[in-house]
């Protein structure tokens, strides 16, 4: 444990292993035995006049719940109680990702990329503005029609001229409503008729 830095401990400041009186390499059977012994000693029913025993019992239960769950124990062994807090907030499968992204080199990489792209301004230009307002836009393949901008006024004028060419063919009457019924019988073909 000399190469690993000291992690934050339980809420009382003691390691969960110390709460149960165990070594970090304790087996699940050792954890169970120690928990039972301490739970009997500090159970609130056996110590009704001692509120400290009740608090100690809660800590023992918490330590037992974490150390008997293999995933939580692994997280606790690697990252301490901060790892357990992160597991509660983001899920047990995202703990490693959280600590990788919160490392100094990930933050430095993010800052470096921000600096070389002008606070990510270049990325916005490439994605949103098609690089230099379309000047660097890729050319369409041979044989395809080139896209161009048409102003709304030109479109309006074209629509007016098309309507004048077609003549006075405007529809001025609403369609009448129609009802349809279906008769399905087992001995005949379905027939559709309006009433």
From Swiss-Prot:
Chaperone recorded as keyword: yes
Superkingdom to which the source organism belongs: Eukaryota
SMART domains recorded: DnaJ (SM00271)
J domain residues: 13-82
Biased composition (Polar residues): 174-189
CDD domains tied to this protein: DnaJ
SUPFAM superfamilies documented for this protein: Chaperone J-domain
Stated name of the protein: DnaJ homolog subfamily C member 5
Biological function: May have an important role in presynaptic function. May be involved in calcium-dependent neurotransmitter release at nerve endings.
Keyword Membrane in annotation: yes
One GO term (biological process): chaperone-mediated protein folding
UniProt region (Disordered), positions on chain: 162-195
Cellular-component GO terms for this entry: chromaffin granule membrane; cytosol; melanosome; membrane; plasma membrane; presynapse
Family matches, as Pfam families: DnaJ
Keywords: Cell membrane, Chaperone, Cytoplasm, Cytoplasmic vesicle, Lipoprotein, Membrane, Palmitate
Post-translational modification: Palmitoylated. Palmitoylation occurs probably in the cysteine-rich domain and regulates DNAJC5 stable membrane attachment.
Membrane topology: Lipid-anchor
Main localization category: cytoplasm
Originating organism: Tetronarce californica
Subcellular location as annotated: Cytoplasm, Cytosol; Membrane; Cytoplasmic vesicle, Secretory vesicle, Chromaffin granule membrane; Melanosome
């Amino acid at each position: 444990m000399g190469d690993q830095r000291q992690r934050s401990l339980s809420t009382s400041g003691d390691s969960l292993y110390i709460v149960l009186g165990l070594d970090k390499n304790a087996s699940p059977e050792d954890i169970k035995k120690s928990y039972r012994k301490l739970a009997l000693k500090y159970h609130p029913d056996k110590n009704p006049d001692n509120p400290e025993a009740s608090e100690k019992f809660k800590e023992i239960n918490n330590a037992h719940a974490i150390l008997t769950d293999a995933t939580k124990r692994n997280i606790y062994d690697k990252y301490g109680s901060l790892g357990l807090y992160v597991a509660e907030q983001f899920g047990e499968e995202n703990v490693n990702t959280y600590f990788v992204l919160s490392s100094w080199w990930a933050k430095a990489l993010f800052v470096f990329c921000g600096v070389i792209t002008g606070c990510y301004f270049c990325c916005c230009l490439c994605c949103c503005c098609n690089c230099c307002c379309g000047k660097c836009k890729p050319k369409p393949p041979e044989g395809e029609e080139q896209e161009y901008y048409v102003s709304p006024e030109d479109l309006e004028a074209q629509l007016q001229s098309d309507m004048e060419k077609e003549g006075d063919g405007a529809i001025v009457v609403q369609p009448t409503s129609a009802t349809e019924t279906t008769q399905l019988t087992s001995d005949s073909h379905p027939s559709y008729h309006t009433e």
